[in-house]
Amino acid sequence: MSDKKTRVEKDSMGELRVPVAALYAAQTQRAVDNFPVSSLRLPKAFIQAIARIKKAAALVNMELGLLEPNLGKAIVDAAQKILDGKHDDHFPVDVFQTGSGTSTNMNVNEVIASLAAGRAGEKVSANDHVNMGQSSNDVIPAAIHVSAALETDRSLLPALEHLAEIIEKKAATLESVVKTGRTHLMDAMPVRMSQELGGWALQIRNGIDRIRAVLPRLHRLAQGGTAVGTGINAHPSFAARVAEVLEQETAVPFKPNASFFESLSAQDTAVELSGQLKVVAVSLIKIANDLRWMNSGPLAGLGEIELPALQPGSSIMPGKVNPVIPEATAMVAAQVIGNDATITVAGQSGSFQLNVMLPLIAYNLLQSIEILANVSRLLADKAITAFVVREDNLQVALARNPILVTALNPLIGYMKAAEIAKAAYKEGRPIVEVAAEMTGLSREELEKLLDPAVLTKGGIQE
């Protein structure tokens, strides 16, 4: 960088040139220079969580008489600007950096200090004022919990609730639609389509419950543990008051963790939440795969439903339309499962008093939350709510399904039923015709016993 485009900043290691328009200072620039690893940056939600903590810390430190009001109010104002999204391009530090996330903590400290200095009319120290009573070692773990809690509450859970509701509403419209059930992808006893979708809905509902079960632990914060969990350099009331301020600002019941040593050295709650996100991802893959199979064809596949045609499916085959939303859903699920593996490894990386893969956990956890939320709404609104059932195809398949003979087992026995099924398969005839010839049951009795709609109710046919 030329001298005209830079200014000189100084930290404990000496002087360094920084872009003249940058709100950050020397420590951020060192991180930019040290870690040109990827194009990945920590999410906006995470940066805002740190800013939220800085704002709360300044308010509490003023209240405790530790921070001069002129400086404290300027810090609060600067942090709010970050929360308002006004300076998003001033956080350039790579995800792959120091494992404590110190570079990102100092990036936020420096930007706030720069903004606050203008309002205060005097120098604001990134370390002594903005970072007062704090350490990167408690700020970053706390920010993981704060950002994940807020994004889960405001984005993911509403999206999953929406998906479950859409599935349930769709199921209610399909109560009378009977189709061939399948196990091992092979023809089985009939089911109502509403029953099939009811299974999907419960998967999502259970996923919501699993995520909600993690939230009380996610609301427990590391803030106040400072460097190693002892709370050195933080006022005894600091942790509780910061949590109270965060609760007032967000309506989320944040509290100090029962052990800051656990908060700093382990990331078990993040690992737990990621695991529950993985369960949701697995559920979404199952739903997406069912939709793709049901939509397959339109002529040489199952052809049970028709998904909305959203875009041309091929650059070479005219007229081809693909199940793009289920495919996108499956890819999101694969990414979330991969993120969970990464978070699992990162969660193991807490040697003694500090986990040293915190930025990686933050990035992957928040990505999983974001993409699951977004794709859940797409799956609901662009696939499930609008698919059309091809009842003619369903009826043809039902009429030719020899497995319906299972309902006769209590009357004629398994072996006789197997003979009938094999004959129907071999001759390609309806099961009712073959059973009428091979049993003493009348056609009228058989049509009643083998009515697909009745068979979906379970029980013993008599």
Regions found by a protein language model. Give the residues of each.
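Conserved, well-structured ligand/cofactor-binding cores
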Residues: 1-462
